[in-house]
Structure formats: structure tokens, C-alpha cells
Regions:
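Short, low-complexity, Lys/Arg-enriched N-terminal segments of secretory-pathway carbohydrate enzymes
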Residues: 1-11
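Terminal signal-anchor or tail-anchor transmembrane helices
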Residues: 12-36
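N-terminal anchoring/stem segment of glycosyltransferases
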Residues: 38-114
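Short acidic/polar active-site loop segments enriched in Thr and Asp
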Residues: 83-84, 144, 170
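Active-site-proximal specificity loops/subdomain of glycosyltransferases
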Residues: 95-146
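Catalytic-site signature of metal-activated, phosphate-bearing donor transferases
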Residues: 122-130, 140, 157-306
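The conserved acidic donor/metal-binding loop of glycosyltransferases
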Residues: 150-154
Length: 306
């Protein structure tokens, strides 16, 4: 009795089909498993990136007005390990409720004088820093150090270096670097993106604003503000220590509208201008003329990466 070819090959065809399906399922399983492992690792890394690197007893004190991307500013510093924020909020009512709802933020609402703001801002900053020191002594947040920066500045580095300072060190300072952009940024751009940074404090650095850094001090009765860039201590016998493990990224006028409004505000003066920066003086003169073309030229000249 003859067996037909189709009957002879049918079991082999079925076996081959099952084997092929098994191979496909195995490959699918391997691919899916590897993808899920990769995705799990990515999620874990993102989670770790958004959690504090170090639980510190360091706080930030700042005086702010119409800040851009305040959520980013807070989150970056929380991730760094900042314990508490002491914020004087000027003429920004839309932010009051939000900041007051943050458990790690102490808010005081204030206002500007509106005249001679280059000098007046520094006067109010000095007063607020000293008030923040007093608040930190009594509020139970266990903040042992305060660092003074602005809302267009981001701290980078290792806060543990602050906490490891010996008891006889009462104040310290950190160098600033200044953001440069590859185009004139607009409202849609996040404030804290830069194409490069100029190393302030070095010769021909390209920094157009301040270059002498920012500072921090112990929360103690002997420490107080000594201008917007330094702290002083009544008992410290040596010069303020420079911390090389921290730096301040300064995103000066991080979009054109902020730049324009800033220098319109600074242009309201009733006394002689003694600002030492060409960038500031040229911008103030253009703002007085309300000349957007000239303002853009100045921004391009000083703030855009060459």
C-alpha cells in the first residue's frame, strides 16, 4: 500500500511550523524582556536623578520678582539636596499661593521702590538675607548654612563639602560661571538651558555681569550679609574660604523679554549712574529709548556665543 507524499510530509510540516512558532515566540520573549529591562533601568536612573543626591542642612535665601521656570529652579536645588528656601517675593502675586503651598519654602511678600533699582535691589537683598538668618535660627527647620543666590542662578556641586567645613570656618564663597546662548532665547525656552558657560573670574572670560561669585554663611549670631556677594563673621579671623566643589551657574537675562523688562526697570533713575558694567550701561540707554532693535543688537553682542 502506497502512502501519498502529502500524508508523508504532513507531520514534518506540522513539526516545522510548531518549531518556527516556538522560535518566533522565543525571539519575541527575548526582545520584550530586554526592552523591559532597558526601560526599567532608564526609569530607575531618571528616578535617581530626581531624588536628592545628599540630604543636607543647607538652605537658600533669595529675593525674586517674576521668576521664569521657578518650578525648575526649585526642583534642581531639591535634587542637589537643599533643605529649605527663604524667598522674598516682590510684585508677583500669581506665585504667592504656589510658593506658600511648598512645605520647604518660607515666603515673605515685598515690593520694590521702582527707582534706582540697581542700588536699591542690593539694599533690600542685604536686609532680607539678614532676616532669613534670624528666621533660620528659630523656625525649627534645622538649617545650619544659608547660601545667597538669585532666581536666575543654579547651584552645582557637592553640598557635603559645606557641611564638612570645620567649626572655625564661618563663611565661604563660590565662583560663578555665566551662561551663553546660541540664539536670542524667547518665552518658549527654558531659562536654564545654555550652549556654553563663560568662566568668570578669569582674564577675558566674556562674563558681562558680576565675576566675584556668591557666598554662604553659618546660621549663627556672628554671621551676617556683607553685600550681595559675601557674608561676614564677627569671630572669623581668616578670609572667607573659597569652595572649589561648588559653583553658581548664572543665567543672566535668560530670554529677550526678561532682558528688556530688567533694563527698563533699571533705567528709572533720579541720580548719577555708577554701574561698572558696559553691558548694563548700554542696555539701560537702549531701554530708555525703547529701541528693541538696539536692545537685540546689544544682547547679540554680549550674550550670544561667538
Amino acid at each position: 500500500m502506497k502512502i501519498s507524499r502529502s500524508r508523508f510530509y504532513k507531520p514534518w510540516i506540522l513539526f516545522a511550523t510548531i518549531l518556527a512558532i516556538f522560535a518566533i515566540l522565543t525571539i519575541f520573549y527575548i526582545v520584550v524582556t530586554k526592552y523591559l529591562m532597558w526601560k526599567s533601568k532608564e526609569i530607575q536612573e531618571n528616578f535617581l536623578d530626581s531624588t536628592p543626591k545628599y540630604s543636607s542642612d543647607v538652605g537658600i535665601v533669595s529675593m525674586i520678582k517674576d521668576p521664569k521656570n521657578i518650578e525648575t529652579w526649585l526642583e534642581k536645588h531639591r535634587t542637589l539636596g537643599i533643605k529649605h528656601f527663604y524667598i522674598r517675593l516682590e510684585e508677583t502675586p500669581d506665585l504667592e499661593e504656589y510658593l506658600e503651598s511648598q512645605p520647604d519654602v518660607t515666603v515673605k511678600v515685598g515690593k520694590s521702590t521702582g527707582v534706582n533699582e540697581y542700588d536699591e535691589i542690593q539694599t533690600r537683598q542685604n536686609k532680607w538675607v539678614n532676616q532669613a538668618f534670624e528666621l533660620a535660627k528659630l523656625d525649627g527647620n534645622n538649617v545650619q548654612w544659608l547660601i545667597h543666590i538669585d532666581c536666575d542662578e543654579i547651584l552645582k556641586g557637592d553640598l557635603k563639602k559645606v557641611q564638612d567645613l570645620p567649626e572655625d570656618v564661618r563663611t565661604f564663597w563660590i565662583q560663578n560661571i555665566e551662561a551663553k546662548f546660541d540664539k536670542i532665547p524667547g518665552k518658549e525656552d527654558n531659562c536654564f538651558n545654555a550652549s556654553k558657560f563663560a568662566k568668570c573670574g578669569t582674564k577675558n572670560s566674556g562674563c558681562v555681569s558680576y565675576a566675584n561669585g556668591k557666598s554662604g554663611g553659618r546660621v549663627s549670631s556672628d554671621v551676617s550679609c556683607f553685600g550681595p556677594h559675601r557674608m561676614k563673621s564677627q569671630i572669623e579671623t581668616k578670609e572667607s574660604v573659597k569652595l572649589d566643589d561648588l559653583e553658581v551657574e548664572h543665567y543672566e537675562s535668560c530670554d529677550f523679554d526678561i532682558y528688556k523688562q530688567k533694563f527698563k526697570n533699571l533705567s528709572v533713575q533720579d541720580k548719577e549712574n555708577k554701574i561698572p558694567f558696559s553691558y548694563y550701561n548700554e542696555s539701560i540707554e537702549a531701554a530708555k529709548e525703547d529701541n528693541d532693535d538696539k536692545l537685540q543688537e546689544i544682547y547679540q553682542k554680549y550674550r550670544i556665543e561667538v
